[in-house]
């Protein structure tokens, strides 16, 4: 059995490397036949890697529940690949497959860490993907969504204030809201969507100095509310997203310089005012000096990454559960320990591939609202990955940010899937409009 488990980890690494290669090949090659061939390979690698991960776990657990969960996930993946392409033939096949690959990796590692959390994650993901099927049509058909910028902003702030007043505190931040005493949600994840819609809609109407000041006040109120919740990681994501959307909309480097300077000053003030920020900075500077207390989490994370080496320990062969909150904030450490450093690097490359794709979609758009919307989501997505991975590997202090589409957390999964579907709607709409224009020109000829 040990030989089989050892072989599965190398097979998963090869599959991950091959998938990553084809993901970038699709990005570079513009020939449709080459892209279609790579898509077929990527689909095969996706399902084979998913099977290999569950096969390795089944060899050690021997549980029928594992087979049922695996079968449910395969069914969902097949339905998504089938129905999304039928309903929206113009969507990005690359973005769709990358999303499913990230979800599959998340399912595997969460099943290894906590079967109950993996089941919960699966059902939430299935519902989110079902809801997401309607999002692209809504985005590219209803142009009036750009007319309610102030409503998006006010609704987002109101939701954050509600959490501040009656929310539940976890890990030092008041970011969770209990619904009917049945389950909790993290409204910040959904406010991210409202925030980007708000900024894109308002700057679509104009970028004069008066409007810039008004929108900045709106964005500042959102960030300050997150600061009062002590969700400084979330506040940082919102702040950086706004600064880059502001710069893109106005094309004035002065705004970018002032924003980044102000952000640096705000970070210094946060360090002076909040004790938990000081603790995280201390743990970042010298984790082994505080290994029994403040530095325990990051120390265990570094031990896990170092233990995994380049090729990993194999599923159920490491000790990732010694890391506090490993299923959410520090899940990248668990992946690096059991799948290996090379696998973890390929994972980062897939995230980078998604980020580049979102940026390219934004650059090709002529409609200012959709351009800002795509860019805002790209920055928000990319910066969240930077904060999550950077905190885990001790590149920056930990900010308590989850890894999109992989970490445990229903709110994060739902919001990220909706975000991807919004982008797909923009992409599909652009392809549909271009095709309609070609058909009209042919008809005229």
Which residues does each PLM region occupy?
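Re-entrant/interfacial helical elements at transmembrane boundaries that shape
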Residues: 177, 238, 316-322, 350-351, ...
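Transmembrane alpha-helices
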Residues: 1-89, 101-107, 130-131
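Alpha-helical membrane-protein architecture signal
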Residues: 217, 294, 298, 311, ...
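A juxtamembrane structural motif centered on a specific transmembrane helix
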Residues: 52, 388-445
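Long extracytoplasmic/lumenal interhelical loops at the membrane interface
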Residues: 305-342, 362-365, 369
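Hydrophobic alpha-helical transmembrane segments of multi-pass inner membrane proteins, especially
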Residues: 62-293, 333, 337-391, 418, ...
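Membrane-interface alpha-helices at helix entry/exit sites of multi-pass transporters
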Residues: 32-37, 188, 211, 255, ...
């Amino acid at each position: 059995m040990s030989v089989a488990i050892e072989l599965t980890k190398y097979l998963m690494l090869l599959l991950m490397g091959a998938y990553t290669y084809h993901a970038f090949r699709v990005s570079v090659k513009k020939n449709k036949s080459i892209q279609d061939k790579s898509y077929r390979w990527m689909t095969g690698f996706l399902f084979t890697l998913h099977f290999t991960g569950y096969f390795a776990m089944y060899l050690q657990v021997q549980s029928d529940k594992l087979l049922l969960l695996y079968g449910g996930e395969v069914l969902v993946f097949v339905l998504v690949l089938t129905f999304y392409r039928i309903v929206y033939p113009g969507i990005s096949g690359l973005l769709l497959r990358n999303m499913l690959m990230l979800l599959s990796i998340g399912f595997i590692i969460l099943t290894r860490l906590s079967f109950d959390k993996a089941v919960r994650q699966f059902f939430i993901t299935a519902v989110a993907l079902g809801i997401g099927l309607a999002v692209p049509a809504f985005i590219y058909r209803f142009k009036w969504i750009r007319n309610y910028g102030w409503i998006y902003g006010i609704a987002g702030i109101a939701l954050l204030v509600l959490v501040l007043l009656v929310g539940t505190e976890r890990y030092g931040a008041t970011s969770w809201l209990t619904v009917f005493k049945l389950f909790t949600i993290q409204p910040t994840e959904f406010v991210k969507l409202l925030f980007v819609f708000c900024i894109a809609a308002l700057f679509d109407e104009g970028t004069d100095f008066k409007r810039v000041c008004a929108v900045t006040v709106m964005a500042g109120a959102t960030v300050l509310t997150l600061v009062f919740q002590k969700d400084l990681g979330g506040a940082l994501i919102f702040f950086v997203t706004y600064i880059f959307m502001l710069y893109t909309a106005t094309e004035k480097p002065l705004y970018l310089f002032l924003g980044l300077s102000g952000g640096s000053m705000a970070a210094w003030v946060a360090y002076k005012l909040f004790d938990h920020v000081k603790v995280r900075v201390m743990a970042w500077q010298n984790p082994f000096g505080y290994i029994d207390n403040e530095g325990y989490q990051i120390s265990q994370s570094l031990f896990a990454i170092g233990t995994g080496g380049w090729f990993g320990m194999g599923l159920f062969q490491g000790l990732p559960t010694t890391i506090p909150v490993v299923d959410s904030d520090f899940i990248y450490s668990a992946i690096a320990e059991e799948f290996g450093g090379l696998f973890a690097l390929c994972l980062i490359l897939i995230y980078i591939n998604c980020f580049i794709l979102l940026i390219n979609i934004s650059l090709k758009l002529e409609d200012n609202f959709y351009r800002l919307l795509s860019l805002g989501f790209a920055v928000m997505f990319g910066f969240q990955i930077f904060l999550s991975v950077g905190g885990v590997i001790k590149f920056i202090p930990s900010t308590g940010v989850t890894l999109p589409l992989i970490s445990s957390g229903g709110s994060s999964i739902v919001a990220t899937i909706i975000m991807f579907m919004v982008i797909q709607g923009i992409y599909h709409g652009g392809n549909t409009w271009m095709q309609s224009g070609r058909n009209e020109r042919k008809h005229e000829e």
